[in-house]
Amino acid sequence: MAKKRVGIIFGGKSAEHEVSLQSAKNIVEAIDKDRFDVTLIGIDKQGQWHINEASNFLLNADNPALIELNKSNQGVALIPGKEDRQLVGTANQSVLDQLDVVFPIVHGTLGEDGSLQGMFRLANLPFVGSNVLGSAVSMDKDIAKRLLQGAGLHVASGLTFTRAAKETIDFESIADQLGLPLFIKPANQGSSVGVNKATTEAEFTAAIEEAFSYDHKVLIEAAIKGREIECAVLGNDYPKASTCGEILPQDGFYSYDAKYIDEDGAKLAIPADLPEDVNRRIQDIAIQAYKTLNCEGLARVDVFLTETGEVIINEVNTLPGFTKISMYPKLWEASGVSYQDLITTLIELAIERHERDKQLKSSVFDRN
């Protein structure tokens, strides 16, 4: 059987650029090379696309704090629509081999907010992960919370402010309404980028400024006392949930550094020490959230489990990390799915959806 040609796209103009590089490194190492030929396409911090070689596509690859994309002199142009000419190398105008599927591992803005997904659809490229709608609504924490609440699921109490309403933000009135401490976060970021905990007005003011430096919309949420539980979901029309895992932060909350820089920043309990009925209930809620937000392919659903047994959804991440300490692949490994098999399944799901969508009519006129 001929190998499938997989384009792994990584990097990007995002605060999560370095996380994406780590994820790409692990996927390249783990992918089944007997079944797939890989083309590496790195996006630098200026948004330029590069065709990279697997042997040297990263600098400082083993240092999460210093990891960099090794830029090439071979750029990429995309030709929408035609299945036999999708990507062109700009250095010598050579046509790259047609890709059978794309595996985007571009975290954060412009990567998992529907932007990249829309481009893949225009280019007629099958791709791993949620479609435009699922990606966009899941990325925007404000919109996601509204949809989840509408579906009867529990989310954290909070307020949303746009930049236009920034001057109306008042620490004392918000603290009276939501209590202390408060969590301040950009609406459209992941990996805890720009997220801060505030117990004083000075901390609050600094956190608001930082959050607005990442987005034009900011969430202010009440702190939730409970265990941080995560569940991985996999599938298109009939998604399945992994066993649950627990995050045990060592510095108060699961910050960016704890996730990706400081290997001692948090402990992971996989599987989580939960009664089986609670594990199943969280799995059911994770699948319900996944369907509510129109997710496909994969997502990680993060929840809080309170002392009273209430399950509160924190966020749904449609392109979770694939670093060596990331929860998503670890949860599936604990559920009996190896890292390599997980990558294979995700690629197969992408192709399956693309073939399904090709059956839809694109015209009201039935012409041969």
Swiss-Prot record:
Molecular function, one GO term: metal ion binding
Enzyme Commission number(s) from the entry: 6.3.2.4
Catalytic activity: 2 D-alanine + ATP = D-alanyl-D-alanine + ADP + phosphate + H(+)
Annotated ATP-grasp domain residues: 145-348
Subcellular location, record wording: Cytoplasm
Key word Signal present: no
Binding-site residues for Mg(2+) 1, renumbered to this chain: D302, E315
GO CC annotation: cytosol
Keywords: ATP-binding, Cell shape, Cell wall biogenesis/degradation, Cytoplasm, Ligase, Magnesium, Manganese, Metal-binding, Nucleotide-binding, Peptidoglycan synthesis
Sites where the protein binds ATP: 175-230
GO BP annotations listed: cell wall organization; peptidoglycan biosynthetic process; regulation of cell shape
Class of the enzyme per the UniProt entry, highest EC level: ligase
One Pfam family hit: Dala_Dala_lig_N
Binding site for Mg(2+) 2: E315, N317
Manner of cofactor binding, per the entry note: Binds 2 magnesium or manganese ions per subunit.
Bilayer-crossing regions: none
Pathways per UniProt: Cell wall biogenesis; peptidoglycan biosynthesis
Names of required cofactors: Mg(2+); Mn(2+)
Family: Belongs to the D-alanine--D-alanine ligase family.
Protein's job: Cell wall formation.
Descriptive protein name: D-alanine--D-alanine ligase
Organism, as annotated: Shouchella clausii (strain KSM-K16)
